[in-house]
Amino acid sequence: MLTLHSLFRPTRIVDAHCDIPCGVYDPEQARIEAESCLRIIEKHDASDDKHFRARCVHVKEERAELVKHHLDVLWHDYFKPEHLEKYPDLHDTFWKATKQASKVKQSLDAGAAKELLSMIDTIDEMWKATGGPDKTRVNGRPS
């Protein structure tokens, strides 16, 4: 027998940055997660404890997935068609960075994590040049 609750419960759960949209965007969110991936890889490599190393892999994979999430939100919600005029490679830059986050998720390669950080820095420069700190942060980006 169907209950009233089962009729009105969501058929799937969806996560989003907020999709109000609140208008708060910053590549720093992706960078913090990518830095975590790099540090976790370093800690993993320095440890002989198999249980700790397994935890490192699990948490690093979660952090790398969050990098992808934060990049996707920034790419799809902040950047607009007019930004393509200044940055015709914008889509390719984000696509490659998201693919790089997948590489970090799949491996324990510190070099891959460093490359991801470099890609996020490039995205950060695009964000800054398009007015990101002033347009999307309450009082600009904290220094």
Residues covered by each model-derived region:
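Long, contiguous binding/interaction regions
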Residues: L66, D77, W95
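N-terminal intrinsically disordered, cationic/polar leader segments
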Residues: M1-R53, H83, P88-T122, M126-S143
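Alpha-helical segments in soluble extracytoplasmic regions
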Residues: R55-L71
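Short, solvent-exposed, charged loop/turn and helix-capping segments
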Residues: H70-Y87
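Short, Lys/Arg-enriched phosphate-binding patches
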Residues: H51, H58, W75
